UniProtKB/Swiss-Prot annotation:
GO terms for biological process: F420-0 metabolic process. The gene is cofC. It catalyses: (2S)-2-phospholactate + GTP + H(+) = (2S)-lactyl-2-diphospho-5'-guanosine + diphosphate. This is 2-phospho-L-lactate guanylyltransferase. It is an enzyme of class 2 (transferase). It comes from Methanoregula boonei (strain DSM 21154 / JCM 14090 / 6A8). Homodimer. The keyword Manganese does not apply.
Length: 214
């Protein structure tokens, strides 16, 4: 049985670095689609998803906790009160699958961690939450390794393409359109996004661009 899966989520104004190709409304809808893909993957791994949101939003059949501190502060408060193992997953991992999440939760170490690109932390399993705290700003991957070491906790770094692939930049959409199969890929395809190859590089294009924000 997998643990509770905490999924931090920002409903309003997400993914600003995609503003060149998605309108504000489209970015919010896309972020929701990615969240739903992550929730589905967590449930496929027999985890119980809990959304840690910056504000209340409509979501059916999932528990929502409102963050009353910054991300790290809120998650650390939850960790301090947890009665058992906890898994933290980012909400922008649309390639996540049940087996990939189970791999993280099945580590025999005290901590299992999947790094993100740019030094971030995309997924982290904490066997004994009272002995660990998170710090999600800056080079969080190295911070979490250090925090585990200082607490005397064993730590496994897990190599997972599906959980390593987060979506922040336009180029990241290539991986989603190539490997994705969930709601977030369908959302992009419904908007007209397709893969394109120019000068030997694969990218994405959208025949009709969104109107600029006013």
């Amino acid at each position: 049985m997998c643990p509770h899966a905490l999924i931090p989520f920002k409903p309003a104004g997400p993914k600003s670095r995609l503003s060149g190709i998605l309108s504000p409304e489209e970015r919010e809808a896309f972020a929701r689609a990615m969240l739903e893909d992550v929730i589905a993957a967590a449930r496929d791994a027999n985890c119980s998803p809990v959304i840690v949101a910056t504000e209340l939003f409509d979501s059916e059949d999932v528990q929502i906790t409102i963050a009353d501190k910054d991300l790290s502060g809120t998650l650390n408060e939850v960790l301090s009160q947890a009665a058992g193992p906890v898994l933290i997953l980012m909400a922008d991992l649309p390639l996540a699958t049940g087996p990939a999440i189970k791999r993280v939760a099945s580590t025999t170490s005290d901590i299992g961690i999947v790094p993100g690109r740019g030094g971030g932390t995309n997924a982290i399993f904490v066997r004994e939450p009272a002995k660990f705290h998170v710090d999600y700003y800056g080079m969080s991957f190295l911070k979490h390794i250090r925090i585990a070491q200082e607490a005397g906790l064993s730590c496994e770094v897990i190599d997972s393409f599906l959980l390593h692939t987060d979506i922040d930049e336009e180029d990241d959409l290539v991986e989603l359109l190539t490997h994705g199969s969930g709601k977030s890929r369908k959302y992009l395809e419904d908007l007209g996004f397709v893969l394109s190859a120019e000068n030997g590089r694969v990218g994405v294009k959208r025949p009709v661009q969104p109107a600029p924000a006013t």
